[in-house]
Amino acid sequence: MFAYFKGSLVTALPEEAVIDVSGVAYRMLISATTFRQLPDEGSQVLLYAHLSVREDALQLYGFFKEEERQLFRLLLLTSGVGPKLALAVLSGLQVPEVHEAIMANEPERLYGVSGVGKKTAARIILELRDKILKLPLVTPAAGKAAMPSHHVKDDAVHALVTLGFSRLLAQKAVSALLEEKPEQSVEEVIKYALATIHNS
């Protein structure tokens, strides 16, 4: 029904965003992955949309990238996986990581996500392994090459927190930088993150 919403970002929270489109405010639930990529409040933003229809409610979900929305919809095809759990998966893992876990038959990578048990992780892999090949997602090889190592991100965030910045601000700045330049060292990430924070 809705392809996307484009407008002014009114509110950006870790679990939801509000966008003003021509004077109408739309509340959308988002993943942590999308939250980290959002611009500052008041900026223009485009979020790809998914409308969940239930008997008692209509709920919009927003995604910064189309491939995240595609994977969200694919996860919903799994028995026992609803929008809340699908969003939790996309908050705990990035798109290439989910793709790799499914293709490599590694359920332990999925049940490390809050709310995903061993049986659910096994079902996701069993039911989606063939379906995921039909999506124009990042290939496992390409995804692995582009993914920054976790220690770089963790060390950079820790350093920024030590310098007095909030963990949320540090995580957002570091994640945004590594999204564009995943090959950066810890020192480079800290340097550019500091510049980004001071210029914001």
UniProtKB/Swiss-Prot annotation:
Superkingdom, natural source: Bacteria
One GO CC term on file: cytoplasm
Keyword field contains Cytoplasm: yes
Flexible linker as annotated region, ranges: 143-147
InterPro entries: DNA_helicase_Holl-junc_RuvA_I (IPR013849), Hlx-hairpin-Hlx_DNA-bd_motif (IPR003583), NA-bd_OB-fold (IPR012340), RuvA (IPR000085), RuvA_2-like (IPR010994), RuvA_C (IPR011114), RuvA_C_sf (IPR036267)
Subcellular location: Cytoplasm
Annotated spans, Domain I: 1-64
GO MF term (any one): four-way junction DNA binding
Record region (Domain II): 65-143
Annotated region (Domain III), positions in chain: 148-200
Cysteine pairings via disulfide bonds: none
Ribonucleoprotein among keywords: no
Keywords: Cytoplasm, DNA damage, DNA recombination, DNA repair, DNA-binding
Family of this protein: Belongs to the RuvA family.
Record remark: domains: Has three domains with a flexible linker between the domains II and III and assumes an 'L' shape. Domain III is highly mobile and contacts RuvB.
Physiological role: The RuvA-RuvB-RuvC complex processes Holliday junction (HJ) DNA during genetic recombination and DNA repair, while the RuvA-RuvB complex plays an important role in the rescue of blocked DNA replication forks via replication fork reversal (RFR). RuvA specifically binds to HJ cruciform DNA, conferring on it an open structure. The RuvB hexamer acts as an ATP-dependent pump, pulling dsDNA into and through the RuvAB complex. HJ branch migration allows RuvC to scan DNA until it finds its consensus sequence, where it cleaves and resolves the cruciform DNA.
Known partners and oligomeric status: Homotetramer. Forms an RuvA(8)-RuvB(12)-Holliday junction (HJ) complex. HJ DNA is sandwiched between 2 RuvA tetramers; dsDNA enters through RuvA and exits via RuvB. An RuvB hexamer assembles on each DNA strand where it exits the tetramer. Each RuvB hexamer is contacted by two RuvA subunits (via domain III) on 2 adjacent RuvB subunits; this complex drives branch migration. In the full resolvosome a probable DNA-RuvA(4)-RuvB(12)-RuvC(2) complex forms which resolves the HJ.
This protein's name: Holliday junction branch migration complex subunit RuvA
